[in-house]
């Protein structure tokens, strides 16, 4: 993006159902950022456009930003399948994942990276704004993600682990903690959001240490 003096660059995954963008400053825009741009650009915020679906991994800052725009925000389980199901259940049109699965129900029934990219670009053209200008209207909460390889995913039910998570949840004024088994790998995934990155990193490291001690 910087080398070519481009306003934006598009990157799709191998099968084309996920997309990320890079803005004119070289910042990588994930699915949360793209969802915000699409929500921001939509003047109709009633009926099928009254809400947005994210997942449990969506940044808390996105939830706050979407709600400030006047939308409802609901979290589905991780996976574009679950986002699509929640959209159908609510009768809404827009949802997606941090990983870049973006679903625009008015254009496609499932995640399509090319469709999502074109929708974002057309939205920015209509706004006559660059990505960074739109995204300056919301702030992400510092987030740390880790994955620990395990032989038994039931570790997430360990009493010591649950006790520690409950303890630190009471210390975090803004943010979230999510511990979940991977749906595709023998791993436990850790996500910690906190007011600053150092706090998030410390808590994530402590949780990882407890899990590793149980393996």
Regions found by a protein language model. Give the residues of each.
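Generic hydrophobic alpha-helical segments
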Residues: 1-2, 39, 83, 164
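Phosphate-binding and adjacent anionic-ligand microenvironments
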Residues: 22, 44-215
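Short, acidic/small-residue loops that bind anionic groups at enzyme active sites
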Residues: 28-48, 77-78
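Short glycine/threonine-rich catalytic loop with a Thr-x-Gly-x-Asp
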Residues: 12-14, 28-35, 108-111
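N-terminal small/polar loop signature for handling phosphorylated ligands or for N-terminal nucleophile
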Residues: 1-22
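Short Gly/Thr/Asp-enriched flexible loops that form oxyanion-binding sites at enzyme active sites
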Residues: 18-34, 62-63
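Short, structured secondary-structure boundary patches
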Residues: 1-4, 32, 93-99
